Design a protein with these regions (language model features):
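Selected transmembrane alpha-helices and immediately adjacent juxtamembrane segments
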Residues: 1-22, 103-151, 158
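Transmembrane helix-bundle signature of multi-pass membrane transporters/permeases
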Residues: 29-36, 151-158, 214
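Selective hydrophobic functional segments
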Residues: 30-80, 160-204
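Transmembrane helix exit motif
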Residues: 40-50, 72-73, 77-80, 84-110, ...
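Cytoplasmic-side transmembrane-helix entry/capping segments in multi-pass membrane proteins
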Residues: 53-63, 84-88, 108-117, 146-153, ...
């Protein structure tokens, strides 16, 4: 939550790089559902002009939400080993594209939005990490506040799909809902702390260090599940 509040990104990546070491990855994805929904809703609604962002990126938002909802229906049937590998690949993709500043000439055209939404949903439904959204929003070269709002909106829509999907698949039940709400409360506290210290941090230094940690943990997940 503190990372999310200070940098605007990285919440699912940080959590999914750590939790699968201790619990089943499907459970980790389930526990993230409500925190992703709430923290990203808080993020994009705090930026002036958010109604216009919804109108501009509605196709991407709907695409990622629907795709995640569908994919989550099958996550309980996928062996944990393969989910861990997908999580690891998602973490590596997320960290490397950010570290290498990999950019593609992106467009707000609905076809681009649908492609980004579907690819993010396929990864996000299994790992909660939606690296294509980061590649897309960075490639659009948006002003900082607009970038935070667009990324927050798309992750928020992914959170809706994840929450509804885990409910539909009975992964989010009485016990896991309570645990997810506890995680949400902790994340929101961290989010507020991060927002307060944002101006005191060197975004570049902190972001780079975190990305290297995420890369290392992603590699660890893949190697331990392949060997």
């Amino acid at each position: 939550g503190t990372v999310k509040g200070s940098l605007g990104i990285g919440f699912p990546a940080i959590v999914m790089s750590i939790l699968p070491i201790f619990i089943e990855p499907a459970l980790a994805v389930t526990l993230l559902a409500i925190p992703i929904f709430v923290t990203n809703g808080t993020q994009f609604l705090s930026v002036e002009g958010w109604p216009g962002i919804i109108r501009r990126f509605l196709v991407a938002g709907i695409s990622v939400a629907v795709t995640i909802f569908v994919v989550v229906q099958f996550v309980a049937d996928v062996p944990s080993r393969w989910i861990n590998i997908v999580v690891g690949l998602s973490l590596i993709l997320f960290s490397l594209t950010s570290l290498l500043k990999f950019e593609l000439p992106m467009s707000e055209h609905p076809s681009w939005q649908a492609l980004v939404g579907i690819s993010s949903g396929l990864l996000g439904g299994l790992s909660a990490v939606k690296a294509p959204i980061m590649i897309y929003t960075v490639g659009l070269k948006l002003p900082r506040d607009e970038f935070i709002c667009v990324a927050g909106f798309l992750f928020f829509m992914g959170g809706i799909g994840l929450t509804m999907g885990t409910l539909s698949a009975s992964l989010l039940n009485g016990t896991t809902t309570l645990l997810s709400l506890v995680c949400c409360a902790i994340a929101l506290i961290g989010f507020r702390v991060g927002a307060m210290i944002r101006k005191r941090l060197s975004d570049k230094v902190v972001r780079t260090a975190l990305l290297w940690v995420i890369l290392a943990l992603g590699l660890r997940l893949i190697l331990t599940n392949l060997l």
